[in-house]
A protein has these predicted regions:
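A conserved regulatory-domain signal marking ACT and ACT-like small-molecule sensing domains
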Residues: 2-184
C-alpha cells in the first residue's frame, strides 16, 4: 500500500528471551527513529521470560535498516528476534475480523491443571471460538507453602460466535462438576 507515493509494508516482529527493564523502550527507540507506525502490540511475561509481538507499518526504504538495527539490539540484549512480512491483504483480513463477537470466560479452581484447561479449551474449539488471550488473574502459586494458595483463576478472551451456546454452557457445567472448577 502507498501513502503519498511512499511504499510501505507491514512487518511482524517477535521477540523472546529474558525480560529486563528498558527492553521495550530500546526497541521502540529504534522503531521511532525510522517513523514506524505500531499497528498492534502484545506482551506476556511468564517467570521472567518475555514474549513480545509488534506489528509495524514502515516505509520499504527504512524496513531493511530497522530490521538490521533491531537484530543488533536483540543480540546486545541477549534476546531472540524474528521478522515476518504481512501483506496488505493479510492485514486487512485481520482488521475485518475485529467485528466478531467477543466473550470472556473465567476458569476458577483451588488449583488449575492441564487436564482442566484442556477440557475447557476443547469446548471452546468445538464451538468455533478462537482464544485471543489467556491471562492469570490471581497471584503466583507457592509450591513451598501450598496452604497459602486460596484459588487459581485464569481468563480467556474469546472471539467468534458459538455454534451452540446452550450446548457450550451445558458442557462447561458438566466439566465444572466433574473437575471441581467453576466458570463465569
Amino acid at each position: 500500500m502507498e501513502t503519498n507515493n511512499i511504499k510501505e509494508e507491514q512487518i511482524l516482529i517477535r521477540i523472546t528471551g529474558n525480560d529486563r527493564p528498558g527492553l521495550t523502550a530500546s526497541i521502540m527507540e529504534i522503531l521511532a527513529s525510522k517513523n514506524a507506525n505500531i499497528l498492534d502490540i502484545g506482551q506476556a511475561d511468564i517467570h521472567s521470560t518475555l514474549s513480545l509481538g509488534i506489528l509495524i507499518r514502515i516505509s520499504e526504504e527504512a524496513s531493511g535498516q530497522v530490521m538490521k538495527e533491531l537484530l543488533f539490539k536483540a543480540t546486545e540484549l541477549g534476546v531472540q528476534i524474528g521478522f515476518s512480512p504481512v501483506t496488505d491483504d493479510e492485514y486487512e483480513n485481520w482488521v475485518n475480523q475485529q467485528g466478531k463477537n467477543r466473550y470472556i470466560l473465567t476458569l476458577i479452581g483451588r488449583t488449575l491443571t492441564a487436564k482442566q484447561i484442556e477440557a475447557a479449551t476443547k469446548i471452546i474449539c468445538k464451538q468455533g471460538l478462537n482464544i485471543d488471550s489467556i491471562l492469570r488473574l490471581t497471584g503466583r502459586m507457592s509450591i513451598k507453602h501450598p496452604e497459602r494458595n486460596m484459588r487459581a483463576c485464569i481468563e480467556f478472551s474469546l472471539r467468534g460466535t458459538p455454534t451452540d451456546r446452550a450446548a457450550m454452557q451445558e458442557e462447561l457445567m458438566h466439566i465444572s462438576a466433574d473437575m471441581e472448577i467453576d466458570f463465569s
